[in-house]
Amino acid sequence: MKQSSSIIILVSGGMDSAALLWLAKKEFDKVYAVSFDYGQKHRVELDFAKKLTEEAGVEEHFIAEVPHLKGIKGSALTDRSVEIPSEEYPEGPPVTTVPMRNLNFLSIAASFADIYEIENIGIGVHSVDSPYPDCRAEFVSAAEAAINASSVMVAKKKNRITVYTPFLGMTKTDVLRIGLELGVPYEKTYSCYRGTIPPCGECATCRQRIEAFRSVGLEDPWFKKER
């Protein structure tokens, strides 16, 4: 049953945010989306985010410019002098970490939530097999507290904004299974950190995506071999 409320989803164009978008369509009355241009090497993901939000039929899709992240040095996603590794994720934070990225993104999404009086903000983080610090439950609860403490809407209406994270505690394969049940068009999603068409198939996010499909007995649509 749908909740009689609204939500704004952080949509990157990748697998997890697509699954969250389709789940939100099922669970909420009004669904908005926001994507971010932050100087990422894989900026092509925004084209896929647009296609996904159009197919999902969201109320509105915002593209937020985040220029200050474009100057972040040391992250392979934004620093042109740092190569995207051809390896799986390490145990600790990888070189593809953009410091405070999700905190920046949630803050921007919260601004839209305040303006449009949206009660929920959705982010498709899954902490079990993610090496990123800002995909953990501790981060989500702290971000939610900060959003509510600074929200004009909350101050006026006395209701809370919830950071909706239904995939927290799941693996990427778990999220994929949910997306398949919901009918997510995975052929319209994109996950490669190198920003190539077709995806490189070698970077950590490509590898994790390919492995998730293998785990459910399927081939990634991007790498499906002709029979």
Curated annotation (Swiss-Prot):
Domain of life, per lineage: Bacteria
Annotated EC: 6.3.4.20
Residues reported to bind Zn(2+): C192, C200, C203, C206
Reaction it catalyzes: 7-carboxy-7-deazaguanine + NH4(+) + ATP = 7-cyano-7-deazaguanine + ADP + phosphate + H2O + H(+)
Cofactors demanded by this protein: Zn(2+)
Membrane-crossing segments per the record: none
InterPro entries cross-referenced by the UniProt entry: QueC, Rossmann-like_a/b/a_fold
GO molecular function annotation: ATP binding; ligase activity, forming carbon-nitrogen bonds; zinc ion binding
Gene Ontology BP term (one): queuosine biosynthetic process
Residues reported to bind ATP: V11, S12, G13, G14, M15, D16, S17, A18, A19, L20, L21
Keyword tags: ATP-binding, Ligase, Metal-binding, Nucleotide-binding, Queuosine biosynthesis, Zinc
Disulfide bridge partners, by residue number: none
Function, as annotated: Catalyzes the ATP-dependent conversion of 7-carboxy-7-deazaguanine (CDG) to 7-cyano-7-deazaguanine (preQ(0)).
HAMAP family: QueC (MF_01633)
Family label: Belongs to the QueC family.
Protein name as catalogued: 7-cyano-7-deazaguanine synthase
Organism of provenance: Persephonella marina (strain DSM 14350 / EX-H1)
